C-alpha cells in the first residue's frame, strides 16, 4: 500500500449545513427539521444555536422578482452599475485573477443593478451542479403531475431506499426519528429510507453526494415511468441493466437540461454531466460539467422570477436552499449574521507533492476550486451573487468568507 498518493482529488460540496425553514417538517416530512426545532427549544440534546437570519418561517420566504420584474434578464447588453462595478473592482484588486463573479442588487426589483468580473469564465461546478439536479427533479414532477397537490403527495409519500448509487460518499447527513434523544450525523447507508423531500434536503443542505446521485436517478425514473413512478425494484433494476449505456446517458442529461433550457438557461454555460458518486457514474456514464458565474446568476434570477419550472417549484427550491444552522464559507461572514442567506457552495481540491507545503482541504496546490452562490436578504437590501475561484494554496473557505463581508458592506453603502 502506498503511504502517499502522487495526488489527491477530493470532491467536497460542503461541510455540514442545513436548509429549509424549521416549521416545514409537518408538510414535507423532513424529520431532521423536527429534531433541530427540538434542539432550539432545549428539548433534546444538541448545542446548535441558529443565527438570527436563519429563523424565518416558511411564509416569510417569497420570490422578489415574480410579478415585479418578470422580463428582466442578464446578458452582454446589461449595463454595469457604476457604483457597484467600481466597488467590485476595488474588492478584487490585488486578488488572484482566477476570481470571477456576477452580482445583482434587486433591492428595488424594478431597477436591478448589475456588476461583474469575468462572468463568462467556466470552471468545474462541483456541488453547484446540484442546482441542476433539483431543477431536473422538479421539472420531471411538473411534467408528470401538473397538479401541485399531486406533486406534494409524490414528494412526501414516495419512500426511496438507498442503494448502490450512494457509493462512495464520506459526508454525513442528519438522522432523526420521533422519540430520539438527539440528532445523529452519519453517512447514508444501504437500506436507509427517506422520502423525496428528505433526499432533496440531504442533497442541498448537507450537500450529500450520495443524495445527489439518488435524486438524479429519481428524475430519470420519473421521466421514464411517468405516472407509473415509482417503479418496482425489479423494474428499476431491469431498466438500468438492459437499456444501452448511451441511452441512459442521454436520458440523464435530458432529465436535467429539459427544465433548465425551458427556463432560458444556456446549457453551453451551465451543465452537470457526471453523477456525484463512483457507482452511479459506472451505471450511467457521464460527460463534461461546467459553469460560469454569469449563468449561475441567471439561474438565481429565474428562480426569483418563478421560472425555474414554475412559481411553486421555484419557491420550494428557494426554501430548500435556506441556510438554517451555524454557517460556513461565504455564508459564515459575521457581516451576514442577521441576514437571511439562501446558499449553495461547491469545492474541489487537488494535491501534489511539494516540499515544505502541507496540502489539504480548501488549500489545494494543484487545484483549489471554491464556488459560492447566494441570495442575501439583509435589512432592506436583497442581492444575488455567484462567485467562482481557483486560488492555489490559499484557504479558500476563509477567502470567500472575507469577500462576502466586503460585498455586504458595498451593497449596504450604496446610495439610495
Where are these regions (language model features)?
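Positively charged n-region of N-terminal signal peptides that target proteins for export
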Residues: 1-4
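Sec-exported extracytoplasmic/periplasmic mature domains
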Residues: 93, 134-146, 204-209, 216-224, ...
